Every structure is written in C-alpha cells, then in structure tokens.
C-alpha cells in the first residue's frame, strides 16, 4: 500500500521512468519535517491543489493552493529555529485555514483559535 500516488511528485532528483509534468487539477502533498534519530520528530502535512496562476510572454505559471484546512499545532515548534519569513508563512496559513472553517465554529471556538493558533 502506498499513500502517495503518481504521476506527480516533487523530488530533488528525478527518478528515471517517473518523469511527469505538474498540471492544473493535480493534488500533491507538502510534508516538511525533521526527525532526530532515536529521539523525536515533527511533520506538518498539507494537500495542495495545482492551479493556473498567470500567463505572460514567458509562459504559463502555476501555483499551489492548500486544500487542507486544519491548523498547525504550533506548540510542537521551536520558534528559535524559525525566521521571520517562516513565522509569517505559518501565521498566513493559520489565517487561511481559519477563513475556510470559521463558519462551522462557535464563537468560543473562534476565540480559542484566534488566541492560541498564531505565533505572536
């Protein structure tokens, strides 16, 4: 059983016989993480939808939009290792997720989310 189905995949090195173009409509995962052997690790995973972004004289450009609207658990992050840009990206995603689920939340849940799931 393999939870990762092709043909698309992003790797530092192409696998012979597994080359595939990424096209609009494809869904792929973004799984950044770090593991300390024999100790601990963390990984945040999101599903991303490939969509057309813009077209100009240089070609057609695509982008990825998250389609997983689950906030990251920031308590597992050591903020000392994150740049300001990385913190801003995490907070941007937290807001994106909130905007997609807020109508299903009670006011108490909204308040908790806004007070606990952003890096200050």
Residue locations for each model-derived region?
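Charged, cofactor-coupling segments
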Residues: 4-120
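C-terminal active-site-proximal or functional interface alpha/beta core segments in diverse enzymes
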Residues: 1
């Amino acid at each position: 059983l393999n939870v990762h189905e092709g043909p698309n995949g992003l790797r530092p090195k192409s696998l012979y016989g597994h080359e595939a173009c990424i096209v609009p409509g494809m869904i792929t995962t973004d799984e950044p993480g770090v593991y300390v052997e024999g100790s601990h690790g963390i990984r945040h995973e999101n599903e991303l939808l490939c969509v057309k972004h813009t077209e100009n004289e240089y070609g057609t450009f695509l982008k990825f939009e998250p389609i997983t609207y689950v906030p990251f658990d920031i308590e597992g992050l050591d903020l000392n290792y994150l740049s300001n840009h990385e913190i801003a990206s995490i907070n941007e995603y937290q807001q994106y997720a909130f905007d997609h689920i807020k109508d299903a939340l009670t006011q108490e849940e909204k308040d908790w989310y806004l007070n606990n799931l952003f890096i200050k």
